[in-house]
């Protein structure tokens, strides 16, 4: 598994700076924690001090750094973080190596369509009737795959993932532990005759397109009718709630603890920061950016950043926030002016009284 410098150059497309004796790379680590045999990277100028003191054997660096401390080998790349990720993938192969087979404790319905020599079904996993699983897919311990679910190739489901009946999962989809795909949408209707809430049946499905990543304990509800869709390449963080009939576009990122109410439409390449709330039956345009804790109560155009609750353009929200911070001083100044005005009014009244006498 060790890499030579030539191996690193080949994997990253980088250029070796200066002449460096041949070294062996045995692992990856941060600049501050790396030791001999490790390779690290400088992807942010905030870590330049760590770069100056790192004990790594090699470092991936951006072009034209002002200085290169003695010690490590330096490999220049356009994007150190992206290049480093390629090296991490190489070393992770040994940890995440795919081993096909069905564990003896797994329960696989005889009508399930899969090749036991090309898929991995972990301990205590349950594969129900009519499920289809593509080659190269790894179903982790304790997962439950409901009736009629279709799963593509090269997917990775970690422990205790639940995919309920008839949902469709594309190729190369990664789902972290505890996520639930296809739970019932939050649909209830108050019955005026009984004074109780009746459950509205949720008969649709969830579709996760190719290369989607779903974080731990995230829940994506099935549609009332039709489909809840997560578009190709989108990445959803931990503890996110996606309501029924939502449509998330391609390559959109949603950070932790955010939630979208039912029938929300989110465009392509949208960035949603942590703890954002989106009301139902609205849309967010392509390439919009929603700052943390933004509250979206009406539809938003794409191509700009938003902040606040209710959401407004980030520049306007920043001005509002700045104005609010000035309110205590403004109030103090107002009270001083009010006091002076009262004093002036008293003097005027006194002067007028003197003239009358």
PLM region descriptions:
Residues 1-105, 172, 178-179, 184-199, ...:
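Terminal amphipathic alpha-helical/low-complexity segments used for targeting or macromolecular assembly
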Residues 41, 101-313:
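Structural signal for interior beta-strand "rungs" in well-ordered beta-sheet cores
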